[in-house]
Regions:
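Rossmann-like S-adenosyl-L-methionine
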Residues: 58-179
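Short, aliphatic-rich beta-strand segments
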Residues: 1-9, 73-75
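Generic, ordered loop/turn and secondary-structure boundary motif
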Residues: 2, 14, 86-88
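Short beta-strand/turn micro-motifs composed of small residues
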Residues: 9, 38, 131
């Protein structure tokens, strides 16, 4: 993310060479900060403990702003899931964005609003994001404001399957559902 890098080392061989990787990335990309955010099932399978620390620079005081496909996202690179944002989903966000114009959109398991914010950037009729993480939905809501679309936005915290059942029970329907 510009002058901040996030490394997610999920394999033992990467962990063993992490200092070399940080040095090489620093030499080539000249970042101000490098965050190591290694946590999750993959590390457990490799016999590794969680590892979250700053390899270079300072921890950002708050979530960082990330512009992508005309939308604005906020990523918590220090405490967020994986690297703070699913940046590898850019092409998929763009694909959904192209489909979303004028449609009501339900983004399930939305994290920080990946598909929903992309839909907003292309004038979706409405966007509802559902996730189990209150901090992630807070970042999605910030992104909705920063994207400055006229699209009505709603963030719902809860178990995705329970929420979808509740929405169906209320008679709510959507023209585009991403989960």
């Amino acid at each position: 993310f510009a002058d901040l890098l996030v490394i997610q080392p999920n394999a033992a061989w990467v962990d063993q060479r992490l200092s070399l990787l940080v040095a090489a990335l620093s030499d080539i990309l000249k970042p101000k900060s490098v965050v190591v955010n290694g946590a999750g099932r993959a590390r457990v399978l490799e016999g590794l403990d969680d590892a979250r620390f700053m390899a270079l620079g300072d921890i950002p005081a708050e979530a960082i702003e990330v512009a992508m496909n005309g939308a604005v996202y906020f990523a918590d690179v220090a405490e967020g899931q994986k690297t703070g944002i699913f940046y590898d989903q850019r092409p998929n966000h763009k694909f959904v964005q192209d489909l979303a114009q004028g449609k009501s959109v339900l983004d399930v398991f939305s994290h920080v609003g990946g598909f929903g914010l992309a839909a907003m950037a292309n004038d979706a009729a409405s966007v509802t994001c559902v996730d189990g993480s209150k901090p992630a939905l807070s970042l999605a809501s910030r992104g909705a404001v920063a994207t400055r679309a006229e699209t009505p936005f709603e963030a719902i915290k809860g178990d995705a399957f329970d929420v979808m059942g509740e929405l169906a029970g209320q008679g709510k329907t959507y023209e585009l559902v991403i989960c």
